[in-house]
Design a protein with these regions (language model features):
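Active-site HxH/HxHxD metal-binding segment of metal-dependent hydrolases
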Residues: 34-46, 111-115, 121-188, 291, ...
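Conserved beta-strand hairpin/beta-sheet module of binuclear metal-dependent hydrolase folds
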Residues: 69-124, 210-231
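Sec/Tat signal peptide C-region and signal peptidase I cleavage site
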Residues: 25-30
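C-terminal regulatory/interaction regions
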Residues: 32-36, 44, 296-338
Length: 338
């Protein structure tokens, strides 16, 4: 294992935060006028067009959005070195390295770990005893619920950003893991032949992290990102933090050449449908998770535009302006999911 602190990542986030009033100030200043939120939502929808991945993102970030119950998919290796196991609602992503497994998220409970993660990894030829790290992308129970079970059974180390370790300690939810390793902004974790870079992307929670890592498809190398927390927070100030994270992470993606988009909630980005497309072979020799660098950047631009709309919805509600269609003003996001 080697940890390397990126000198640029924290600076990138701070610069993005500092520039936010300049980049978006004029737009946000006028966002309190009637219909401004709807303009953002309509713009995002136009950018998404008929792209099923982007359209699903628009839906997931729209005011009042809810994740429906769906049947859990069968486990699948979506890349040569990446496996996904899922409850349908939430997924765990296993990075298969020459030195063992880095598991991003651990589903919702010890039972999920015992009855889903362990047997389903085995069904894909992955030995769960080789899980070396469990990374909680953020401090909600649907992401860390099985972490302590894996730590107890296999000696896996559990990683989370300090802000969300504190969140977990304050909330004291069921199945919370014991505090173990902190994730620093820009930190690199190397296991075997794979290095993962973690970026702080606060907003969904104070300590949400989004990793960037190499993947292989039929021997060809690509670069993936996994957005750590999708559901926008309730408070307007936290939505602004989310927006700053989107801007900073977009720059990091561009710098890294990200051409693969992943999410821990597959209904937020058409990920479950893409799993079935890949499983059924309807994508031919291609991989539907390889969306290309320009489309990955457009994905983030859609996210940015939707967040500007959500901020505008809050402002319209606070000034007595009629909220955009489908909005109830400051939307009460589900506090412990997504």
């Amino acid at each position: 294992m080697s940890f390397e602190q990126s000198r640029l990542s924290r600076r990138t986030l701070l610069v993005a935060s500092a520039l936010l009033p300049l980049a978006g100030g004029a737009a946000e200043a006028s966002a309190a006028t009637a219909g401004r939120a709807k303009e953002y939502y309509d713009r995002a929808a136009r950018m998404a067009g008929d792209d099923p991945v982007l359209r699903q993102l628009v839906k997931a970030l729209s005011p009042g959005a809810a994740i429906p119950e769906v049947k859990a998919p069968k486990p699948l290796k979506i890349f040569d070195n990446v496996a996904v196991v899922s409850t349908g609602f939430v997924s765990a992503t296993a990075l298969l390295t020459s030195g063992g497994v880095i598991l991003i998220d651990a589903l919702g409970s010890p039972d999920d770990a015992k009855k889903i993660i362990v047997p389903e990894l085995r069904s894909l030829g992955v030995d769960p005893s080789t899980i070396k790290y469990v990374v909680a992308a953020h401090g909600h129970s649907d992401h860390f619920g099985g972490a302590q079970y894996l730590a107890d059974q296999y000696g896996a180390r559990v990683m989370m950003a300090p802000a969300d370790w504190r969140l977990v300690a304050a909330d004291r939810p069921a199945n919370a893991p014991k505090r173990d390793l902190d994730i620093a902004d820009g930190q690199r974790l190397t296991l075997g032949d794979t290095t993962v870079t973690f970026h702080n992307t606060p907003g969904h929670t104070p300590g949400t992290v989004s990793p960037i890592f190499p993947v292989r498809w039929k021997g060809q190398r690509h670069t993936a990102m996994l957005w750590g927390g999708t559901n926008p927070p309730t408070a307007t100030k936290d939505k602004r933090t989310y927006l700053a994270s989107v801007l900073a992470f977009t720059a990091r993606m561009r710098q890294a050449g990200v051409d693969v988009e992943l999410n821990n909630h597959g209904l937020c980005d058409n990920g479950l449908a893409r799993m079935e497309e890949l499983r059924g072979g309807s994508s031919g020799a291609g991989n539907p998770f390889v969306i290309g660098a320009p489309r990955a950047q457009r994905f983030m631009k859609v996210m940015e535009t939707m967040m500007r709309g959500r901020i505008a919805s809050d402002q319209e509600a606070s000034t007595g302006t009629r909220p955009a269609a489908g909005s109830a003003g400051p939307v009460r996001s589900i506090p412990d999911c997504c």
